[in-house]
Amino acid sequence: MKNSFYKLLLIPFFLLTSLGAIAEELNVSAQEIQLNKETKITYATGNVQISDNKKNIIFTDKAEYNKVNELVRSFGETDIITSQKFRIQGEDIFFDNKKQVIYSNTKSVITDINGNKIYTEMFNYLTEKNMFFSQGEVKVVDNRNNEYLFSEVYIDERKRKIVGSDVRSFFNDPSFKTNDKNEPRFFANSAYIDDEGVTFDKGVFTTCQYREGKKCPPWALQAKKIKHSKAKKTVYYEKALLKIYDFPIFYFPKFFHPGPTVKRRSGF
């Protein structure tokens, strides 16, 4: 039988793909590369490194490239550094070179340049827009160990912003707790996280202990918008309503209080 494979060892290899006049170049290096000229599939094994001209780099131990579909697939543990220096860790990740999207339907961890981690069940990464999307059970753990649970999120690498819906946020940072019994948390319709802090839309804040199955905490602050400013160390509320056992007590058009890291502040 005629051998349909070409084998290349320990050398970089360039894959040129194009639909029209413009070619997108992928740079592949591995300990061993095999080319199947009949199926037009390239197999790479051993210290595989694949990069595009946007400087997205895929690291894995085994991968294949289907020239017909312009699809790269990794097998097993995979590490990706995006052009904006975000890190993706997961398994069995795909790179659709035709659509310019990197995606996975298995659990992955995305780490941004500030050390915040996003745990996903699936993700799509648009390499042209530097934008992630994920849905399902999405957990964000920031660099202070605070947790945010979303049903879906968008991550904008360029603006360094995370936007998500159906958020439940648990602040585990010790500075947010006045005693061990406090469990500060924000529940909201949506939220976005950036370098300035966190903003919640149509949210509720309380520090009462979380009681699974209970309808309401002893007290809570409900507001149209809640913003925690890291720079000013202050929590701001718009159209806030103080509730005691879910019964409305006071309404404040605007309201703010010092953040938990502030011990004393004159005025209110």
Give residue spans per PLM region.
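Structural signature for solvent-exposed beta-strand/loop edge elements and short helix-capping sites
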Residues: 23-268
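Bacterial N-terminal signal peptides that target proteins for export
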Residues: 1-9
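Bacterial N-terminal signal peptides
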Residues: 9-18
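Compositionally biased regions
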Residues: 5, 19-22
